[in-house]
Amino acid sequence: MIFSSSSESDYQWYYKFRVVEHNIKNLETESNNSESSADKVKLNTTYNGIMMLDDEDYYVFTAPTKVKYIIKAVNTDIDHYYSLTCALYNNSYKCLASTRLDSGEGWKKIGTVSLKKGQKVYMKYSSYDRNFCYKLKVKKVS
């Protein structure tokens, strides 16, 4: 790629670019912007999400057994002090837990829920900040 100056000095700059593709496992799918289009989450699997300006991302977890589950998330942004709101809802859209994840906080518990086999919990992630990434995970409570 060559960039040239528009001035009379006739400068030219030569640049080489290399594009490397990196596949991210368990990346959210768009459009997961509502309960009806929520991405399905499996137990003990880390999921990656990309938060965009005025974005809302939904996930759903269906309990494989009757037990308590803990939902954790991390805001992976380290440079901009962006925040992310995380909320857990049941089928009736009743809020079970809610918290804010700030840049640099590390993994944080969103909530602990007792679910029967087949019951669902919805996770809503939202932000009014610019683009950044986050991760989430559901585990059984020991």
Predicted region positions:
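Acidic, Ser/Thr/Pro-rich low-complexity intrinsically disordered segments
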Residues: 2-16, 21-23, 50-142
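Predominantly extracellular/luminal regions of secreted and cell-surface proteins
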Residues: 18-43
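Short, hydrophobic/aromatic-rich segments at coil-to-beta transitions
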Residues: 44-48
